[in-house]
Amino acid sequence: MPVKLAQALANPLFPALDSALRSGRHIGLDELDNHAFLMDFQEYLEEFYARYNVELIRAPEGFFYLRPRSTTLIPRSVLSELDMMVGKILCYLYLSPERLANEGIFTQQELYDELLTLADEAKLLKLVNNRSTGSDVDRQKLQEKVRSSLNRLRRLGMVWFMGHDSSKFRITESVFRFGADVRAGDDPREAQRRLIRDGEAMPIENHLQLNDETEESQPDSGEEE
């Protein structure tokens, strides 16, 4: 075993970080110690995770995550269609001028309103109830499902709740996993809008995956004080 890999595995940060990565969490610059650790040992950890048929990826935006291959030895499950749609909306909000104006903080209501503005409400309601009639009860269920999706994406490191107030959150750069394939000279925000409205296909690697076995047991480390 290479000396640097042995040092990485012996580091006290590694056990919790390894568990987080295996559960599908994205590690961005906000997690200073973990991110610096991955930067220092990236080359050796890439070889380590390759043994499990997963790739340690550092995205252009700087965050890290594990991308499973078809033969992965780490349990996985694919996010729901609504989870993916919420992720696309979060990416759109990240690109919006409002993010700077609001110091990067959004509310769950703003997320829900943007979702209804950009996506087809009838299709969204069908995701909750295939026989939806557009009733107030169906809309309430949709809002609850959106909250659940946001919480699931929090566990993936896409958003940070503001302290103990889960109604407010800050979006991280990891939402670019849901980003549109921006063409040369194109406006990123407009490309993201097309992705949401026209249902453009996302690259296969963007079909995010999560280890369900650890999902509920993950600590609420995505909160800010």
Curated annotation (Swiss-Prot):
Disordered: annotated span: 197-225
Keyword Cell cycle: yes
Keywords: Cell cycle, Cell division, Chromosome partition, Cytoplasm, DNA condensation
Gene for this chain: mukE
Protein source organism: Shigella flexneri
Gene3D superfamilies assigned to the protein according to its UniProt record, in alphabetical order: 1.10.10.2250, MukE-like family, C-terminal domain
Pfam families associated with the record: MukE
InterPro entries xref list: MukE_C, MukE_N, Scp_MukE
Name this polypeptide is given: Chromosome partition protein MukE
Gene Ontology biological-process annotations: cell division; chromosome condensation; chromosome segregation; DNA replication
Record localization: Cytoplasm, Nucleoid
Function: Involved in chromosome condensation, segregation and cell cycle progression. May participate in facilitating chromosome segregation by condensation DNA from both sides of a centrally located replisome during cell division. Probably acts via its interaction with MukB and MukF.
Residue spans of biased composition, Acidic residues class: 212-225
GO CC aspect terms: cytoplasm; nucleoid
Family: Belongs to the MukE family.
Assembly mode: Interacts, and probably forms a ternary complex, with MukF and MukB. The complex formation is stimulated by calcium or magnesium.
